[in-house]
Amino acid sequence: MSKLLEESLKTCPIVKRGEYHYFIHPISDGVPLVEPELLRDVSTRVIKMIDTDVDKIVTAEAMGIPIVTAVSIATDIPYVIMRKREYLLEGEIPVHQETGYSKGELYLNGINKGDKVIILDDVISTGGTLVAIINALKRAGADIKDVLCIIDRGNGQNIVEEKTGYKVKTIVKIEVVDGKVNILE
């Protein structure tokens, strides 16, 4: 299996904002450049890890979108984006989201009761986004089959499981130490 994702993480820039060290990577930030080879590698690995017998893939705005698009094209599974603004469509479900760096609302549309779904996102750190997505999908009556994040940084997997009962699959677990990304698994 290709390790393009891991190799690209080891060399990505780190930016300090306050006391937090952000890693800047094409999968999590869309900069400096998203290479098709990396997106193909990641989406291929995702497809091998998820239940593809589903009706829809769900992600949150914004950086889950490139990954979900690639997976959708390869599997012919349509996707839904939870947006950061409301559209006032009938049946729209608002849900509060709190992450390690922001708070706000997410809005779910396009999910029907009984839809079999998978959740796919770019990074999990605090778990706040995934908890919000899961809560909205439960309110909609969806059947959540899989939850997967590409990059795991932090304790978010445990938090999501404690708060929702869902296990989060990840491709790679990292930490940022001394200005660089270390691959843990």
From Swiss-Prot:
Disruption phenotype: Increased resistance to the base analog 8-azahypoxanthine. The keyword Glycosyltransferase applies. Pathway: Purine metabolism; IMP biosynthesis via salvage pathway; IMP from hypoxanthine: step 1/1. GO terms for cellular component: cytoplasm. InterPro entries: HGPRTase-like, PRibTrfase_dom, PRTase-like, Pur/Pyrimidine_PRTase. It catalyses: IMP + diphosphate = hypoxanthine + 5-phospho-alpha-D-ribose 1-diphosphate; GMP + diphosphate = guanine + 5-phospho-alpha-D-ribose 1-diphosphate. HAMAP family: Hypx_phosphoribosyltr. Belongs to the purine/pyrimidine phosphoribosyltransferase family. Archaeal HPRT subfamily. Homodimer. PANTHER family: HYPOXANTHINE/GUANINE PHOSPHORIBOSYLTRANSFERASE, XANTHINE PHOSPHORIBOSYLTRANSFERASE. Catalyzes a salvage reaction resulting in the formation of IMP that is energically less costly than de novo synthesis. This is Hypoxanthine/guanine phosphoribosyltransferase. It comes from Methanococcus maripaludis (strain DSM 14266 / JCM 13030 / NBRC 101832 / S2 / LL).
